[in-house]
Amino acid sequence: MSFSRSAADAADTLPDLAATLGAPALGAFVTLGDAFHTRLPAAPLPAPYVVGFSDEVAQLLGLPASFAAQPGFAELFAGNPTRDWPAHALPYASVYSGHQFGVWAGQLGDGRALTIGELPGTDGRRYELQIKGGGRTPYSRMGDGRAVLRSSIREFLCSEAMHHLGIPTTRALTVIGSDQPVVREEIETSAVVTRVSESFVRFGHFEHFFSNDRPDLLRQLADHVIDRFYPACRDADDPYLALLEAAMLRTADLVAQWQAVGFCHGVMNTDNMSILGLTIDYGPFGFVDAFDANHICNHSDTSGRYAYRMQPRIAHWNCYCLAQALLPLIGLQHGIADDDARAERAVDDAQAVLAKFPERFGPALERAMRAKLGLELERENDAELANKLLETMHASHADFTLTFRRLAQLSKHDASRDAPVRDLFIDRDAFDAWANLYRARLSEETRDDAARAAAMNRVNPKYVLRNHLAEVAIRRAKEKDFSEVERLAQVLRRPFDEQPEHEAYAALPPDWAGSLEVSCSS
């Protein structure tokens, strides 16, 4: 059986998928051994149906565009093979540990996620397929192993939206729903979302083996990550120190991109940090609407630890946790016989690497903000100009996405064209004062207004996944109308295009959107 076979014989081939996705098709991670995962079948999801499907991700995986319409598709990605899983093809849940809200939480793991296979991508990479909501695992703790329709749709939509914003992320192939009830803050229905990524290894995987005093397994994991994803680190003087630096730099770049589009992750625990620098684990995330630097998207985050302005600091802190976990490996190649001396040097080397985080993050964010302001030339006070705009937006609660999008309409010479963006500010005088500074800075640029506007519209999205847009799609999906999930997904594929036929998706949020809350209860 092969995914590439025609739809005509799909009824015969899809039930056999479980028999073909065994080792080595489950991927390299499963070969690390039983200490890294537990093999088990998914719990059947009754009467599954397709809620959403990304033909782009299917194409990436070499699957036909008609794949979702083939018989057995919903059963397959609900984790319900029509035949028993053969032993060699059993999915797996991986074990990891981590810090949650800054506190050591001990062993965690894939409590409701199962990796069901790995496929070669059309881009030459290999991608793991992981179903979230596949039932209880040994790492479920008090959970039921299920995901709900609400959170599954949000993850599906945002994974693809972030990709089209150019932000590193896991992808999402499909959402499968079911009428099976589950209890959260209220009674909801079950769903399964299929995530796609080169790897789902997290900072917490390294923390797990460090905390359990297993340097042998820690090294095995690090070697796996280096050999498969960071091969250049193998040639470094210290491969494990190089791994720390490479992962840290990707993390700094990622969070700079988050800040530039007003994205809040919501739960930046170390077990939710990808070793590849990807946005992973979409839970109580949100894009900032009315700008507030202290915006908290997760109503479970009562202390504001993961507020918008805190994300860079938390990312840096999480890198310290990764560094601590890698300390037993750093400096091994130096041949220092004295363990205390080697450990002391490892700490010094790790701290030197960690000191580079702000050196990477700051310039990355400055470049992003310069582009958002349409500034082609680099000037010393550009960061100050950008920060002053954010302060003015904060004071007026101006809409984040629309402010930057409408700035493209501002003229270098004609203040009468300021109205579209100016009207977003309560304090118009404060905006006018900033706009005068901005115009003075634009006078140093060589591009005309049209060229600058075109450049700004390529980096300032018109469309992002605002909470109220997702909520409308979710409410309709609960009534078995999935057209809004599809429509919204299509709009978010082209976030920088005008799409005049979809203007309503770029409007300010309605008043009722202010009462929406998202939390970890998914």
Swiss-Prot record:
The broad enzyme category this protein falls into is transferase
**EC id:** 2.7.7.-, 2.7.7.108
Q: Coiled-coil regions in this chain?
A: none
Which keywords does this chain's UniProt record carry? ATP-binding, Magnesium, Manganese, Metal-binding, Nucleotide-binding, Nucleotidyltransferase, Transferase
Q: Which cofactor does it need?
A: Mg(2+); Mn(2+)
GO terms, molecular function: AMPylase activity; ATP binding; magnesium ion binding
Pfam families per record: SelO (PF02696)
The protein's annotated catalytic reaction(s) are:
L-seryl-[protein] + ATP = 3-O-(5'-adenylyl)-L-seryl-[protein] + diphosphate; L-threonyl-[protein] + ATP = 3-O-(5'-adenylyl)-L-threonyl-[protein] + diphosphate; L-tyrosyl-[protein] + ATP = O-(5'-adenylyl)-L-tyrosyl-[protein] + diphosphate; L-histidyl-[protein] + UTP = N(tele)-(5'-uridylyl)-L-histidyl-[protein] + diphosphate
The UniProt entry annotates the active site at D271
Record-linked InterPro entries: SelO
Q: Does the keyword Protein transport apply?
A: no
Tell me the domain of life. Bacteria
Residues that hold Mg(2+) according to the record: N272, D281
Q: Which residues bind ATP?
A: G109, G111, R112, K132, D144, G145, R195, R202, D281
Disulphide connectivity of cysteines: none
The cross-references to NCBIfam families, in alphabetical order and at most eight, read: PRK00029.1
Family named by the database record: Belongs to the SELO family.
Q: Check the record and name the PANTHER family matching this protein.
A: PROTEIN ADENYLYLTRANSFERASE SELO, MITOCHONDRIAL
Quote the protein name from its UniProt record.
Protein nucleotidyltransferase YdiU
- What is the native source organism of this protein? Burkholderia ambifaria (strain MC40-6)
State which gene encodes it: ydiU
